[in-house]
């Protein structure tokens, strides 16, 4: 652009209106209310014991830091077999370190 007066054609090179895109969805859905009710009924019929077996209880382990002897609390959720393995490690050579000592190294 050279000159003292600016003209619009220098800025607008080609303006072409875009064709409009149809955003309407023509898909029709089947009524899924019956399916949802069936799923809810199945969950209610499922025995309470089976639901509890899916979720393992959370255990809190309270111990001391092996470096500074401050309290350390560890929350664990696992099946019984893995908890027994953790118990054996904690009774053996595995020691827990508090966050403060862990950052000090």
Swiss-Prot record:
**Location relative to the cell:** Host cytoplasm; Host nucleus
Question: What domain of life does the native source organism fall in?
Answer: Viruses
Task: Name any Gene Ontology BP term.
Answer: DNA-templated transcription
Which ranges are annotated Acidic residues under compositional bias?
Answer: 32-41
Assigned keywords, A-Z: Activator, DNA-binding, Early protein, G1/S host cell cycle checkpoint dysregulation by virus, Host cytoplasm, Host nucleus, Host-virus interaction, Inhibition of host innate immune response by virus, Inhibition of host interferon signaling pathway by virus, Interferon antiviral system evasion, Metal-binding, Modulation of host cell cycle by virus, Oncogene, Transcription, Transcription regulation, Viral immunoevasion, Zinc, Zinc-finger
Please provide, alphabetically and separated by semicolons, the GO molecular function terms listed in this UniProt record: DNA binding; DNA-binding transcription factor activity; protein domain specific binding; zinc ion binding
**InterPro entries per record:** Papilloma_E7 (IPR000148)
Matching entries from Gene3D superfamilies are given as: 3.30.160.330
Q: Which GO terms describe its cellular component?
A: host cell cytoplasm; host cell nucleus
Zinc finger residue extent: unnamed: 65-101
Q: How is it modified after translation?
A: Highly phosphorylated.
Q: Where would I look for the motif Nuclear export signal in this sequence?
A: 83-91
The annotated region (Disordered) lies at: 30-49
Q: Per its database record, what is this protein's job? A: Plays a role in viral genome replication by driving entry of quiescent cells into the cell cycle. Stimulation of progression from G1 to S phase allows the virus to efficiently use the cellular DNA replicating machinery to achieve viral genome replication. E7 protein has both transforming and trans-activating activities. Induces the disassembly of the E2F1 transcription factor from RB1, with subsequent transcriptional activation of E2F1-regulated S-phase genes. Interferes with host histone deacetylation mediated by HDAC1 and HDAC2, leading to transcription activation.
Q: Which family does it belong to?
A: Belongs to the papillomaviridae E7 protein family.
**UniProt note: domains:** The E7 terminal domain is an intrinsically disordered domain, whose flexibility and conformational transitions confer target adaptability to the oncoprotein. It allows adaptation to a variety of protein targets and exposes the PEST degradation sequence that regulates its turnover in the cell.
Quaternary structure annotation from Swiss-Prot or TrEMBL: Homodimer. Homooligomer. Interacts with host RB1; this interaction induces dissociation of RB1-E2F1 complex thereby disrupting RB1 activity. Interacts with host EP300; this interaction represses EP300 transcriptional activity. Interacts with protein E2; this interaction inhibits E7 oncogenic activity. Interacts with host TMEM173/STING; this interaction impairs the ability of TMEM173/STING to sense cytosolic DNA and promote the production of type I interferon (IFN-alpha and IFN-beta).
- Please identify the protein, giving its name as recorded: Protein E7
Protein source organism: Human papillomavirus 30
Q: What is the lineage of its organism?
A: Viruses, Monodnaviria, Shotokuvirae, Cossaviricota, Papovaviricetes
Name the gene that codes for it.
Answer: E7
């Amino acid at each position: 652009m050279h000159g003292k007066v600016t003209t619009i054609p220098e800025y607008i090179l080609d303006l072409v209106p875009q064709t409009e895109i149809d955003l309407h969805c023509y898909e029709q859905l089947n009524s899924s209310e019956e399916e949802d009710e069936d799923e809810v009924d199945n969950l209610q019929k499922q025995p309470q014991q089976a639901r509890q077996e899916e979720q393992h209880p959370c255990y809190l382990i309270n111990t001391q830091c092996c470096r500074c002897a401050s309290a350390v609390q560890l929350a664990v959720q696992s099946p019984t077999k893995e908890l027994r393995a953790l118990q054996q490690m904690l009774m053996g050579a595995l020691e827990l370190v508090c966050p403060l000592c862990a950052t000090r190294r």
